[in-house]
Amino acid sequence: MAKELRFGDDARLQMLAGVNALADAVQVTMGPRGRNVVLEKSYGAPTVTKDGVSVAKEIEFEHRFMNMGAQMVKEVASKTSDTAGDGTTTATVLARSILVEGHKAVAAGMNPMDLKRGIDKAVLAVTKKLQAMSKPCKDSKAIAQVGTISANSDEAIGAIIAEAMEKVGKEGVITVEDGNGLENELSVVEGMQFDRGYISPYFINNQQNMSCELEHPFILLVDKKVSSIREMLSVLEGVAKSGRPLLIIAEDVEGEALATLVVNNMRGIVKVCAVKAPGFGDRRKAMLQDIAILTKGQVISEEIGKSLEGATLEDLGSAKRIVVTKENTTIIDGEGKATEINARITQIRAQMEETTSDYDREKLQERVAKLAGGVAVIKVGAATEVEMKEKKARVEDALHATRAAVEEGIVAGGGVALIRAQKALDSLKGDNDDQNMGINILRRAIESPMRQIVTNAGYEASVVVNKVAEHKDNYGFNAATGEYGDMVEMGILDPTKVTRMALQNAASVASLMLTTECMVADLPKKEEGVGAGDMGGMGGMGGMGGMM
């Protein structure tokens, strides 16, 4: 296919036009007084959002070179969202600012490579300053404030996330689901829960809840299908003598074995319930081992030379209580040793560091949470489906931001941290004038998030930025109320990781654009018009009258 080429300033100007158009659409959502953006959908109602990355993802231009610029900045927003969970609008505003200032310098004849080196040096200095300014985010109040800011000043969302983190710990899994009412709800599952229910409804012993509840049971873990009852006789006899109930977790329980267990259960000889093991393949083996460590049991597996016939009561795990429903099994208060459980968690975390797959990382994180004890579910309430989607996206954003805050700490919000980090550039010098220009480009660019927040709130950006720059520490401007003061005391906080990732990603992509000298795109296809003469063949249809 034939290609179209653009070089030098022409290429950069086209790219800049795309970046400006995208940034104009995204930046209106920034800050507490940011506006909504309405996105058309191919079917159903349009989506209303204040989430920068949602807006960016929807934008595409017909003009190929403009589109290439927009797609590169879209990558900044997506990358920041993936790694930090928030800060997408900040990253977009920073990228545009660096590119606009940098383009002026390149047009004035400066060396783009030296400008890039200067920008990179400045980013490194500002990042170090941000990390030095960062304070740990320990208490629920700070977590709630971070969540509130990230959810566009919705205090209810900040409070429910802080409550969820308090209940399941900072490593616990918090999931977001659609609620049924108008209010947000929080439910917490204590202990380990996995998504497998009873194999037969005849195991139910609580008719009211349609569940099987076992108090202080033994737990038999088997890494294969169980179809013959003979294999299990010695274990069943031991359990029956002890008078305690039994939970069997196996790949499957079928045929004669299942029938015998059901009959024994119904006659009250031994109180028993059987469920399928969670997961598939290697993940199933790993999860069985997790349950074994949690309950102080052994997985009966022929791979390690243990047969079901030779199993004894010493091989069985135990827990305080187990609840099995049609869909889920919950193990509460397993009797495993804390040291062994912590060692297992450390081992899974090491695997999380090594894996390159997001799916695998998510599954490993779930396993950590189940071992650490707890899964919280936030059910988002709203009046309409459109509001539900928008609110759910904000809750997920706020959740990511609070995780980032717990991980790397917090800095003053509202763009104040970046203004304070400018001081790190005062003593920074490049190897030549062009590098110094690169440092100055970043110095000006890191004011842009505050300028945009202030502009969206309807105030004069230059006046506010100058006043904030004259003061020290956390002194800043609260765009929601129009007041100056200590940002931390006012509860306006940003996760350090979000601010850092937004700056690094924005500078990385903007520097690449500045050093672009050629752009290549497909030539648009020429539509071949259909000639009117082609319709002539239809004259023969006149003869169809005879068909009547």
UniProtKB/Swiss-Prot annotation:
Domain of life: Bacteria
EC class: isomerase
Protein's job: Together with its co-chaperonin GroES, plays an essential role in assisting protein folding. The GroEL-GroES system forms a nano-cage that allows encapsulation of the non-native substrate proteins and provides a physical environment optimized to promote and accelerate protein folding. May play a protective role against the defense mechanisms generated by the infected macrophages.
Catalytic activity reported: ATP + H2O + a folded polypeptide = ADP + phosphate + an unfolded polypeptide
Name of the featured protein: Chaperonin GroEL
Compartments, as annotated in UniProt: Cytoplasm
Enzyme Commission code(s) on record: 5.6.1.7
InterPro entries xref list: Chaperonin_Cpn60_CS, Cpn60/GroEL, Cpn60/GroEL/TCP-1, GroEL-like_apical_dom_sf, GROEL-like_equatorial_sf, TCP-1-like_intermed_sf
GO molecular function, one term: host cell surface binding
Family annotation (HAMAP family): CH60 (MF_00600)
GO BP, one annotated term: regulation of entry of bacterium into host cell
GO cellular component: cell surface; cytoplasm; host cell endosome membrane
UniProt KW keywords: ATP-binding, Chaperone, Cytoplasm, Isomerase, Nucleotide-binding, Stress response
Pfam families in the record: Cpn60_TCP1
Gene name for this UniProt entry: groEL
Native species: Legionella pneumophila subsp. pneumophila (strain Philadelphia 1 / ATCC 33152 / DSM 7513)
Quaternary organization: Forms a cylinder of 14 subunits composed of two heptameric rings stacked back-to-back. Interacts with the co-chaperonin GroES.
Binding residues annotated for ATP, in chain numbering: 29-32, 50, 86-90, 414, 478-480, 494
Family statement: Belongs to the chaperonin (HSP60) family.
